[in-house]
C-alpha cells in the first residue's frame, strides 16, 4: 500500500494497524495537516489540534456536515446528543446533564462513589485470584464501570446485560472498515440507540414524582434556571451517559493494565509509590488514550492551519492520540513515564466538548489499577499484542488474556 500522506486515514483505520497506530501518527505529524484522497483533512500536531478544539469556527454539530448520514438523524431515530451539537444548544444541555453529576450543584456525587467502586473492584479482583487464567476485559474491566454507571443512573442490575448489548452495537456503528458499506451497521447502531433511549425514558418516567437516590431521578425531578430536559432530550442524554460512562473506561483500564505489564519497572514503582497513581493515570490518558481521534468536525469558514487552508464544510479529523505524542510538546513522548509532570494531554479532549465524565473515569481507573497491582501481583500476558476491537476511534483490546503465576 502506498505511503502517501493522502492515504493516512485509510491506513489508520485499517485493522492491520490497530495494535500499533503510533508510527502512522508520527508520519502524520511530519505533515501537520494532511489532505486525504476523499477530501477530508487530518490534523495530528499538538498546537494545531489545541487551537482547533477551541476555535468557534469549527463545528461539532452533525447537522453541519457536508454530507450528513441520514441514518444518524431524525426521523430515523433519536437526535444527536449534546456532544453532537454546538452552542447555545450544547451549553444548555450540558449544564442540565451536569446538574446532578458534578459541581457546582452536586459537588460530592463522584467522590461519594469511591467506597462502592473500591468494593466492586476488590470483589472482582478477589475472584480473579482464584483463576489460573482469565480475561481482564470480561472478568474485570467491563463489569466494574458498567456496574458503577448503571448504579449511578439507577438501572436495575438485571438489565445490565441488555444495556451492554445495546451499547456495544452503538459503538460498533463507529467502526471504520475500508471498502465496507457502513449503512447496515450504522442503522443497527441507531436502532440500538433508540431502543436504549426508550428504555431509559420509561425508567425515568417511573421516577417522576417518586424519586430515588440516582441520576435519573434527579434529571426528571430537579429544576433549575435552565428548566428541565424534554422527554427526547432526556432519552438522548441518558443514552450518552450510559455509553460514555463505561465504554471508554473499559478501554482505559485495559490499556492501562496492558501498559503496566509491558513496563514492569513502572508497575513496581506504582506498587512502591501508590501516591503516583493519579499521575500515572494521566500518563495513560496521554500514552494509550481510549479515544484516538474525533471522526469529524466541520469548518464553518475557511481556516488556515499550519499554512494550509482548510475549506469551509470539508470533513476535519482531529487525531488526538497523535497530538498527545507530539515531541514538540512532550519530551520523550513514546516512553510511558508514570511520574510525568506538565501532562496536558488530549485524553479527555479539550475546549467546550471536553469529557464531562472525566472525574468518574479517572477515579474508576485509579482504583481499578491500584486494586489489580496490589491483589494480583504481576500476571503474565498470554497474547501480546492482544486481539483488538475493530473500532479505530474507541481503541482497546477486545480481550486481554492473562495468567497467574503457574497458570
Model-assigned labels for residue ranges:
Residues 1-407:
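Cytochrome P450
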